[in-house]
Amino acid sequence: VYLYTMPKVHVYDLKVQPVVEESLENAKLVLDMEICGKVETVEKSADDAKMQNVSAKITLTGSRDDSKEGAAGSVSENTIFFETISFQPNNTSDTIRFTDTGAATVHFEQQVSHPALWSAEHPDLYTLTVELFDESGNCVEYISQNIGFRRFEMKDGIMTLNGKRIVFKGVNRHEFSSKTGRAVSKEEVLQDIITMKQNNINAIRTCHYPDASGIYELCDRYGLYMIAENNLESHGSWDAASHGLVPKDTIVPGDNMDWEPMMLDRVNSCYQRDKNHPAILIWSVGNESYGGKVIFDMSEKFRAVDPHRLVHYEGIFNDRRYEGTSDMESQMYTSVENIKKFLAEHKEKPFICCEYTHAMGNSCGAMHKYTDLTDTEPRYQGGFIWD
């Protein structure tokens, strides 16, 4: 827990979407920013709430793949662009919109040629900085945000990153320390990341809630793909219903629309905090909560706010009424033979094991059968070891 103060005029929200063209040759940086607050002026007027004489400088620095232009060098460091935006009430630019409260929204797009693409093998990052200046020209706020250019999509039923089929060699990770319980130090998190990379692990599923922000930043920097999971698990209610102990209409959230506002709020919180991390390829609605209309609507909320990522949910395996909840087939502890059988009968989606091999104690045997399957079955795209 920490407290901090903000200047009277400050950046309330920053959304950055690096959109890479299908050719992978060029990209577009789409930035949406909300500035709020009031500026003190000597002469009070009707425009006091507006941000008179406030400006923002936006700068992108990082790597550029010169090899695409035939240059001798491969990657070069440089300033990609910088832009100064003035928040004048009479500004007629399409970039800026003022609200009734005096806040300003900024929509800004910039072409980037030959970007160095982010991946687990080459986690090339750019640095976006936003400097906010008050009416006296003083820098009152400085924001630095790492961003990565990458193209993740479903193509012909296969998940691809930067035009190539991706295979997840992943683990599930609870936020827990063997020494301090739920209070995990930054040093332990860093050691986790380094250990994963040393063992050829390339992906994390944040089971079953958003983790502390630091691990997302480390995954950006070191190169680990993420399934970022929303805070939802109601294992007990559907487990009891599946054994006939309680009626199915008692499953939470199920089709009970009383739960929907709370669940959509959780999805929004999950998205808003972590939306700018290139490591996040997939949003996960939650874990082991059966199915139903509410969970389907949660998946649609993710898609509405973020069309550049996919959405995951394993629970459709137990409730097939809303197949569209998950963009991929996701199962737990399914044998290799049953994966083959399923894919032979269902060709609509790729398949991942969001939990498999149950690696506690002296276990994890025969894992090679799963890794071998990624070489022979294109639509089997890996899994995440439990625990």
Where are these regions (language model features)?
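Secreted/periplasmic carbohydrate-active enzymes, especially glycoside hydrolases
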Residues: 2-218, 222-226, 266-267, 281-282, ...
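Substrate-binding/catalytic cleft of secreted carbohydrate-active enzymes
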Residues: 193-196, 203-387
